[in-house]
Structures are given as structure tokens and as C-alpha cells.
Design a protein with these regions (language model features):
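Non-ligating segments of multi-cofactor redox enzymes
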Residues: 1-77, 83-86, 90-125
Length: 125
């Protein structure tokens, strides 16, 4: 008889490429992201999982421009529906393949997705 039990955590399952895990804001090696703070993902979320806090930066021309201040993601409320990813006009967020989310403190499930000191990638409008 074939053994089908996996000895987790020693044996990890192979995760499918289209698996929907938690939402992540992608940063490059220069700590830059593509989020403009447009709040399209926040509006698309059916249960208020995402909260975008924006600020106004001044451009070199002296104009005020909306920018991302804080990207708050509440994993405990997320249904992994992918609507936020589909709504993002700059493809700044994606669904990760992480599946281990057990914590003793529920507050650890609320995450700030933008890194400290991160800024918008040049050329993203």
C-alpha cells in the first residue's frame, strides 16, 4: 500500500503557482514599489481588509501629488478572493504562496506592507 501521509513540517507540500495566499506589496532591490496610493484595491475589497493611508508629496515642479504613506493589510479578515490584485492598475500587489499564518497574538495578523523608507518607483503614474 502506498503511503500518502506527509510528515509536516519535515516534508512541505508543493504549492501550486496559482495558489492564493496573503497579499504582498512587491518591492525591488532599491526598496521601491509601484503603489500610487490610488485606493483601487481598498475599494475593491469586499470586507475592508485593506486600508490605504495617503499623504501629499511635492513634486520638483512644486505640485502636490498623492503618495502612499501606509498600506495596512488585515490578514485575519482576508478571504483571499484576489479582487484587490485584479483592481490594482500598476500591478503593485500580488497574492503570495505563504500558508503558515498561525500566531498567538491576533494583532500580528495586521501588517504594514510597505517597507520603512520605501518610495514609489520612478516612472509609475
Amino acid at each position: 500500500k502506498e503511503i500518502i501521509t506527509q510528515q509536516y513540517p519535515d516534508e512541505r507540500p508543493v504549492i501550486a503557482e496559482r495558489f492564493r495566499g496573503e497579499v504582498v506589496l512587491m518591492h525591488d532591490e532599491n526598496n521601491e514599489h509601484a503603489c500610487t496610493g490610488c485606493t483601487a484595491c481598498e475599494l475593491a475589497c469586499p470586507n475592508g481588509t485593506i486600508k490605504i493611508v495617503t499623504k501629499f508629496d511635492t513634486t520638483p515642479e512644486g505640485k502636490k501629488k498623492k503618495a502612499l504613506d501606509t498600506f495596512v493589510y488585515r490578514l485575519e479578515m482576508c478571504t483571499m478572493c484576489n479582487l484587490c490584485v485584479e483592481a490594482c492598475p500598476t500591478s503593485a500587489i500580488k497574492m503570495d504562496t505563504a500558508y503558515e499564518h498561525s500566531v498567538f497574538d491576533r494583532n500580528k495578523l495586521t501588517k504594514k506592507l510597505n517597507n520603512e523608507g520605501s518610495k514609489i518607483r520612478s516612472g509609475v503614474e
